[in-house]
Amino acid sequence: MMTTLRALVIAFSMYSQIPMPQFTWQDKEMKYAFCFFPWVGAAIGGITMFWWWFCGKFSVGNVAFAMIGTAIPLAVTGGFHVDGFMDTMDAFHSYQPREKKLEILKDSHIGAFSVICLVLYELIYIGAYSEIDAVRQAGIVAAGFFLSRCLSGIAAMTFPGAKKEGLLYMFTSKAHERAVKTALFLQTAAVAVLMLYLDGVTGVAVLVGAGLTFLYYYKTVSYTHLRAHETLSD
């Protein structure tokens, strides 16, 4: 029981800004931490639903609803994933060989492409957020934070890594693969059922979109990894 609780605390300590008890991380606890990665999304979803209720209760306008709603994930995570997104966009749009892209990922400076892609992403996000006008739609958005982390966790445990170092490698290399994958797949199934219950049509659209995106990146990453392996073998 204590190992499970510590694994939960590690997940929140690593992937959120929510204050957590401090202790020395042990391998036996870290190997289950990824099981609780989606729960960070659950926390974001819970705050999102509270914000939806607050806006309805006190007649907050759509602009404030969308802007602050967009800020909630950033505030909870501390922009952890945004930092990675920006690094990735700089590397991807450099159109350089794989080794050069890995160097760009390590560079702490931001480039023009990362800023452009982030602004584009946030504008689309705010625009979509402003169109939420029903509690069930808000519920699906909230559940989406959980779903995205389920799929992200599955990808981290399944896709070949770009490098054998860094925080992601540290967590995935120490993870109990079978237990983590089982937990993530079960949680994915559970949140999928919830989305379909909230709104069948919207739920199907979200799940299909998420599934296709996952498959696209699976094929892309697997192909890139295969080509890199073939190049090293030549």
Question: Language model features by range: what are they?
Answer:
Residues 17, 81, 90, 118, ...:
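Alpha-helical transmembrane segments and their lipid-water interface positions
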Residues 150-184:
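Solvent-exposed interhelical
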Residues 183-223:
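Glycine/small-residue-rich hydrophobic helix-like segments
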Residues 31-48, 88-136, 140-141, 178-195:
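Multi-pass membrane catalytic core of lipid/isoprenoid biosynthesis enzymes
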Residues 21-23, 154-163, 215-223:
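C-terminal ends of transmembrane helices
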Residues 224-231:
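Conserved small/polar residues in nucleotide/adenosyl-binding loops
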Residues 2-23:
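Membrane-proximal soluble regions of multi-pass membrane proteins
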Residues 36-86, 140-142, 202-218:
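Membrane-embedded alpha-helical segments that form the functional core of polytopic membrane enzymes
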